[in-house]
């Protein structure tokens, strides 16, 4: 922890095409080896696929998908008297979006389609329809929190 107080949050610039900070954060999350241009191309192509398949604005579909992925509760390990308890805690808004974006990208990468554009587009569409691996991850996280409700009084 820093001695000079809390570290200031770095603000990302909105992306040029959709003028959204969320999209920029997704681009940054997908980026490998600093290749931001490639990451942008992949995302914009994925959004084109989403527009093609749904006929809706891709930003709306993406925001709905993210809303369906973002967790409300998670468990954190807390050591009490030599035993580790999984204590359910509420997820802060900033962490919610971060986890949502992380899960979206990770589970898109694990999909079987040929290109990353198709994988990402399909994962976004699945998440928007409340199906898919990233939504299952959120459900599992909530289930864990529900199962460990008894330890909620250990919250800090």
Swiss-Prot record:
Keywords attached to this entry: Ribonucleoprotein, Ribosomal protein, RNA-binding, rRNA-binding, tRNA-binding
Pfam families: Ribosomal_S7 (PF00177)
Keyword Ribonucleoprotein: yes
Signal peptide span: none
GO BP term (any one): translation
SUPFAM superfamilies assigned to the protein according to its UniProt record, in alphabetical order: Ribosomal protein S7
Record's keyword annotation contains Mitochondrion: no
GO CC terms: small ribosomal subunit
Molecular function GO labels: rRNA binding; structural constituent of ribosome; tRNA binding
Disulfide bonds: none
Superkingdom to which the source organism belongs: Bacteria
Summary of subunit composition and partner proteins: Part of the 30S ribosomal subunit. Contacts proteins S9 and S11.
Role of this protein: One of the primary rRNA binding proteins, it binds directly to 16S rRNA where it nucleates assembly of the head domain of the 30S subunit. Is located at the subunit interface close to the decoding center, probably blocks exit of the E-site tRNA.
NCBIfam families attached to this UniProt entry: rpsG_bact (TIGR01029)
Protein family per UniProt: Belongs to the universal ribosomal protein uS7 family.
Annotated protein name in UniProt: Small ribosomal subunit protein uS7
